[in-house]
């Protein structure tokens, strides 16, 4: 955790209060646990009030909350698709824009997207689209904030061993079956913090295979990339061709 720098206090925002309390013993700073559902507009107003009352000097904002469901478009409830957009896109933008007035030169902003941000991904269509938004938003914001001396970077991991991954597969119904490699979350974050503090990159990508895949999908037609993905998932025909 020393790589994070030195802070007077760490604000940790999530829905589950028990997880927030457990985090207190894992970091070397005083922790303020804040239980909020960021898809609730009222929660964002509460966050705005917290900022206005505390008027903190924010040294680092890490937007890493996310929600995903994998599967055919007709297998994922509309409410879940809209929740992905609300949390992965709308809440991230709100947290960023509410916090930026409290960030000075030298502050850092980290947004979590995904390898799926670089290509269209059948059976992850809404999730991957939200991550493409995060990547584009983060890179353009990085350029805008450069004159202010605020460092902005996206983190684009491949498959990662997390509780999120397990939940995302619950609706998959075998639509997504092939994962070439699962990375440890701590290794992804270690690379991200190195890149954030020691490089000028606007995108951090952990793992040589993931970096090569990003390069490859930039060169190949997206139609071919999607066809390869479908074959990897053992879907040689589209659903309406069955």
Predicted regions and their residues:
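Canonical Rossmann dinucleotide-binding motif of NAD(H)/NADP(H)-dependent dehydrogenases/reductases
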Residues: 1-9
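Rossmann-fold cofactor-recognition segment
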Residues: 27-42
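Conserved NAD(P)H cofactor-binding loop of Rossmann-fold oxidoreductase domains
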Residues: 64-69
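Substrate-binding pocket helix/loop in short-chain dehydrogenase/reductase
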Residues: 72-73, 80-83
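Active-site helix of classical SDR
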Residues: 96, 130
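Residue(s) in the substrate-gating loop at a strand-loop-helix junction
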Residues: 114
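SDR active-site lid
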Residues: 147-208
């Amino acid at each position: 955790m020393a790589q994070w720098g030195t802070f007077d206090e760490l604000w940790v925002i999530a829905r589950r209060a028990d997880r927030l309390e457990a985090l207190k013993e894992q970091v070397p700073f005083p922790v303020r646990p804040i239980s909020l559902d960021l898809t609730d507009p009222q929660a964002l107003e509460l966050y705005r009030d917290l900022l206005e009352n505390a008027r903190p000097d924010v040294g680092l904002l890490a937007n890493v909350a996310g929600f995903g469901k994998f599967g055919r478009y007709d297998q994922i409830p509309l409410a879940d698709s809209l929740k992905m957009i609300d949390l992965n896109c709308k809440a991230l933008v709100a947290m960023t824009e509410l916090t930026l007035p409290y960030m000075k030169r030298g502050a850092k902003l980290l947004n979590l997207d995904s390898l799926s941000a670089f290509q269209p991904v059948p059976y992850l269509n809404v999730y991957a689209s939200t991550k493409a938004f995060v990547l584009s938003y983060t890179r353009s914001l990085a350029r805008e904030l450069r004159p202010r001396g605020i460092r902005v970077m996206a983190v684009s991991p491949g498959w990662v061993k997390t509780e999120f991954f397990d939940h995302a597969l619950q609706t998959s119904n075998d639509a997504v079956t092939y994962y070439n490699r699962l990375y440890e979350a701590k290794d992804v974050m270690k690379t991200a913090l190195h890149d954030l503090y020691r490089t000028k990159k606007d995108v951090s990508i952990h793992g040589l295979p993931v970096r090569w895949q990003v390069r490859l999908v930039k060169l190949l037609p997206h139609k071919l990339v999607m066809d390869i993905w479908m074959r990897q998932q053992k879907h040689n025909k589209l659903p309406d061709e069955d």
